[in-house]
From Swiss-Prot:
SUPFAM superfamilies: Nucleotidylyl transferase
Protein name from the UniProt record: Phosphopantetheine adenylyltransferase
UniProt keyword terms in alphabetical order: ATP-binding, Coenzyme A biosynthesis, Cytoplasm, Magnesium, Nucleotide-binding, Nucleotidyltransferase, Transferase
Source organism of the structure: Geobacillus sp. (strain WCH70)
Binding-site positions, ATP: 10-11, 18, 89-91, 99, 124-130
UniProt main location, coarse: cytoplasm
Task of the protein: Reversibly transfers an adenylyl group from ATP to 4'-phosphopantetheine, yielding dephospho-CoA (dPCoA) and pyrophosphate.
Gene symbol of the encoding locus: coaD
Family matches, as Pfam families: CTP_transf_like
Length: 169
């Protein structure tokens, strides 16, 4: 039986930290579904479709990685993919408490799906999509934080937002 994992997240945008976890997960599991959360309570910078497109581009070198979106409960999505594992990255101890709550709830919902935590490579321990967006918004250098295609998408997105703001005033 193939080992299948789901690596969930909002990926708004995907960073080198995310890619580190996906790449390492793809070495451990036969199949990894990168599941882009369609969270209606958040107002993302990129649409789900844009995030999927960027993720597909940057995960192209990994033949056993499939990028899709999902809504609803993660365990339901994992079950629909016959996944026995959820793969999560941890940057710091501060991530652990939140992740333990989610893991405990997922275990209540389906005790057959295990959660695996991978410590993010130390060079990405500080990295978050929020930080990347904040730096990019002010034209800071993000080339060490995100792949080139993501950097370009961020520059275009903020240029269009700035242009729209000027047109509205």
């Amino acid at each position: 039986m193939a080992s299948i994992a789901v690596c969930p997240g909002s990926f708004d945008p995907v960073t080198y930290g995310h890619l580190d976890i996906i790449r390492r997960g793809a070495k451990v599991f036969d199949q990894v579904y990168v599941a882009v959360l369609n969270n209606s309570s958040k107002k993302p910078l990129f649409s789900v479709e844009e995030r999927i497109e960027l993720l597909r581009e940057v995960t192209r070198p990994f033949p056993n990685v499939i990028v899709e979106s999902f809504h609803g409960l993660l365990v339901d999505y994992a079950r629909s993919k016959n996944a026995s594992a959820i793969l999560r990255g941890l940057r710091a101890v501060s991530d652990f408490e939140y992740e333990m709550q989610i893991t405990s709830m997922n275990r209540v919902l389906d005790e057959n799906i295990e959660t695996f935590f991978m410590m993010t490579n130390s060079q990405y321990a500080f990295l978050s999509s929020s930080i990347v967006k904040e730096v990019a918004k002010y034209n800071g250098n993000i080339s060490d934080l995100v792949p080139p295609v993501v950097e370009e998408a961020l520059r275009k997105k903020f240029a269009s937002l700035t242009s729209n703001e000027r047109n509205e005033s």
